[in-house]
Amino acid sequence: MTAVRLKDIRKSYGSVKVIHGVDLDIEEGEFIVFVGPSGCGKSTLLRMIAGLEDISGGTLEIGGEVVNDVPPSKRGIAMVFQSYALYPHMTVYDNMAFGMRIAREKKEEIDRRVRSAASILQLTDYLDRLPKALSGGQRQRVAIGRAICRDPKVFLFDEPLSNLDAALRVATRIEIAKLSEAMPDTTMIYVTHDQVEAMTLADRIVVLSGGRIEQVGAPMELYERPANLFVAKFIGSPAMNILPAKIVDTGAKTTVTLPQDRRVTLDIATPESQKSAAVSFGVRPEDLTIATGEQFIIEGTISIIEALGEVTLLYVEGLSGEEPLIVKLPGNQPYQRGDKVRLTADPAKLHLFDAEGKALR
């Protein structure tokens, strides 16, 4: 088992700073997912851990050893990329065994590792096939198997599902989850822009933006208690609805005014100094419901309906011209475009963010 420690890790290309002092402790056997928009630095951070990018500043430890200047081959890591990079003229067995043969491992040890990895990944029946006879998902599993055969201290995954279609992406994601369960003592670091992968695979998620960590936590912690406006809008699909608001009452509970001069009281404590402060009011689409009485947050007209079978998404245009709110309701719904609706939510499910975007608790 191997822990990974990042201490004030920085990366610059000339005068351009791309990673700004990242501090992160990854525990032994933990499955960590780096997630964020394009250009946030997640792949750069992974490549620095792998040794494929030089570290401009800070300290990287793997298994208690500082590895800043240790070459990639000596770090005890194995990496799986977006591209499978399989040798087309070699069988699955030979592709998985190739690295060990180059390292001059014993034939018996090579065979044991290949067959063990094939068993974990359900590839035993395909060992004699060429890559062209495999599906995209099976090819990616061969690439993962090749990494397993290295018997690494740490697995690094750089967007391994990006080249797969939707169905294969789901199937291969499940295989990676099974792999994590089958190898509970192996530390895994996974990069993706897909929050579904992050939410379903991770023990903890690291949300990155602009080369900085915005929040680290368990998937549901980030979903239910985002640290700031960026995380609130990035985690969750559809994204959290955000409305401009103003605090009018503070204390153990907070009252705000919303567009349409609606007043809403939230189960959030704020100090007296926040009175009259401009804030952002947030509510997730699935936490909104259609109000039947006079108690509601906002009202508007349904402009778009997306019936997805499992759920229905309503896009509600407010009477004051603000951005449409998205309402996520279960199953099929009887509403029509042009219907006027009033929306409400459980006060415990509402969020507030200050002018800098920091969550108010």
Positions of predicted regions on the chain:
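ABC ATPase nucleotide-binding domains
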Residues: 31, 75-78, 82, 86-230
